[in-house]
Amino acid sequence: MQTTDGYDYFAFISYNSKDEAAAKRLHRTLERWKLPASLVKEKGLKPRPMQKLFFAPSDIVPKELEEVLKENLRASEHLIVVCSPTSAKSAWVGFEIDYFCSLGRKENVHLIIVDGEPKSQNPDTECFHPNLKKHFNDLLSANIHERHFKLPYLNRQRAYVQLIAAMLDVKFDAIWRRHRRRMIEK
């Protein structure tokens, strides 16, 4: 089943195995995300546009790993890079970034920081992979640790909404106000 613009997957989630818990949480959140009806109608989007995401290891079929990754990167409209000090050192994350950018879809690369600091110049805390810096002059990202609220859960939710708004090319407030209201109602 194809999703948007002829792609099999809305997005490919690139992460290091040490960040699997954060990547799984992101994967679950995005696949279950439902857009406000007003936004669906106004922008002509699907109510659940991110239902189909490529997430390894659950979506990997036994073959040669590099070929499987290339095939699924080609089949994905977006690349989400889960950024952390461990992913910044990962050869596979670097490969996925390089290959996706070689497809001519650099504008569809999105970053979410789950650990570490951007542009820290310290390899123990740097969260951006060197290949990101090679392809992009300015790196914009959602950061689950950015403190807007006292509760870490709300900061994480805000970062997810930032990521979703960027991928769908909609205004952050168009999604955030509605999502925040739903969280308060619960």
For each feature predicted by the language model, list its residue ranges:
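Short mixed-charge
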Residues: 32-54
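C-terminal interaction surface of TIR/SEFIR-family domains
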Residues: 1-31, 52, 58-76, 85-94, ...
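Inter-motif core of Ras-like GTPase G domains
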Residues: 79-81
